[in-house]
């Protein structure tokens, strides 16, 4: 287990995104750019559970951590993580007391 850091030169952003997404894994990625709006657009197209922009490894207990593809299943942290450890149950109670025998 370890990070993968491919460093290649590209002329077309669509090719970059296609290459980045052409993997069985999708835990996390990072986009580095002086143009934050463009970086956000690129981040939205990456098939990963987490994308950092101009930084890496920032996280909080409120932020869900979930991998895409073969990078795991389920989620940790945040409301999504809490749901992984719960099992919903519905209990119905009649409105009238006549229903109780």
Where would I find each of the regions flagged by the language model?
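Conserved C-terminal structural/oligomerization subdomain of aldehyde/semialdehyde dehydrogenase
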Residues: 1-101
